[in-house]
Amino acid sequence: ASCLVGSEMCIRDRVKANVYQFNFKSIDGKEINLNDFKGKPIFIVNTASLCGFTYQYSDIETLQQKYKKDGLIIIGIPSNDFGNQELSSNQKVKEFCTINFDISFMLTEITNIKGEKGHPFFKWVKKEAGFLAFPKWNFYKYLINKEGLLVKWYASTTRPNSNKITTEIDKIILQ
């Protein structure tokens, strides 16, 4: 059953398509093909370097360290779409994240989320999970199961290493 609780939504019964159709460019210009991650859980977060939620990079890295042995794929998607809070180049974003948070999870290049130039992944999120799931700000989070289906989303205020999220990741890993 679909359920709406605060800033998250359980959408297992609504989602029909999987994420394996989508590609991103990495912060280093290489291809990130989600099809390469079939059979693994995926956690996607839209990010920004100058946001009040930027501290969540540390929480995301904590997830990376905790779950990398279980195959969790984490992808951060820097964007300047919300409050112009991203740095001016991919190189600056990479340096910022390395120096300040020592991240080891994947980052895409700076990516459009909103509007006509918005990445197809986010259009898919809106189609599959509804308007509320579409990012309204930085640090929206999307949890995808081993079949490539979007099963949960979380708004900016939900910390990546919260019990809400880690409990769901644990469930997916055990499937």
Positions of the model-derived regions?
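Single conserved hydrophobic/aromatic residue that forms the stacking wall/gate
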Residues: 1-11
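Proline/glycine-enriched tight loop/beta-turn segments at coil->beta junctions
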Residues: 37-41
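Structural microenvironment flanking redox-active thiols in thiol-disulfide oxidoreductases
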Residues: 53-118
